[in-house]
Amino acid sequence: MFFRLIFFIFIFIGLSSSTLFSQSAFYETDAIREIQIDFYDENWDHLLDSLYVEGENGRILANVSIDGSTYYSVGVRYKGYSSVSVNNIKNPFNIKLDHVIEDQNHEGIDKLKLSNVIHDPSFLREVLSYEVCRKYMPASNANYANLYINGVLWGLYTNVEAVNKEFLIENFGSKYSPFFKCNPEDLNIQIGGLNSDLSNSHGSDSAGYVPYYDIESDYGWSHLYHLIDTLNTVPEEIEKVLNVDRTLWMHALNYSMINFDSYIGYGQNYYLYLDQASQFNPIIWDLNMSFGSFRLTDASQLFYGSFDISQAQNMDPLVHHNFIS
């Protein structure tokens, strides 16, 4: 009886491990994944260009193979904003495996984010930055993938773990709390321009926040308003609504890695999730232009196209506050 019990325990552990650690294994940095996209439409590039130009988040269908495993009726669109161009041959991709077929996934992963390594001849910025960030706060796993499109090698991409419900479960132990992607619909590059920075309250009506925050949970607008209101009216109570330690780590990491395409630049490219302690946690995102690749530091023309590494290293840590907040 004892040996039979031990046998079943080992079976259970084996099955559990394959689920719990599948995402980490898929993103191991010593592995280069092979991903093949076979679009249903011959003019797939024109269709994706059109969706991007029109500002639509629609997807077109394709079959996708990942390390030899094939998935059908997958939804594909471009990923990102500044890294996409209709003039580019190599654009970034957002691949949704369960777009049509419910629960379709690869080793527990239902969405792939492939970055085109724009402005990074070293191919190291994004993967290295996430590796550093994960030592101090929850952040995506990332490695590399060779991408083939309709049988043609399209190039080497960075393969970045999506910040989604699976990510939330793994890092926070829950997935249903208020969850926001903090990216404005229309980026405002002017000094003092409104973006997804928490110094700006848009009132108690959720409609005022829609242009700046994309809600990815079933509820949470009132929680976001409470966070912003507390930060701006009763800052002494900040620790009741915000994980201050992780917030400081995010700012420190952005400054140390000279990553200005983030909160400290335009006030964008981060997530907020309300944990079980009722504190919002920032989640760093979009590190493809770290180590000085992004030149517009504070939504002004202060250093646009001209600042050097020395200037970046000695930048005032309050530059974002002085120009934006």
Where are these regions (language model features)?
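Phosphate/dinucleotide-binding and metal-coordinating scaffold of catalytic cores
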Residues: 22-325
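N-terminal secretory signal peptides that target proteins for export/translocation
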Residues: 1-3
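Sec-dependent N-terminal signal peptides
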Residues: 5-18
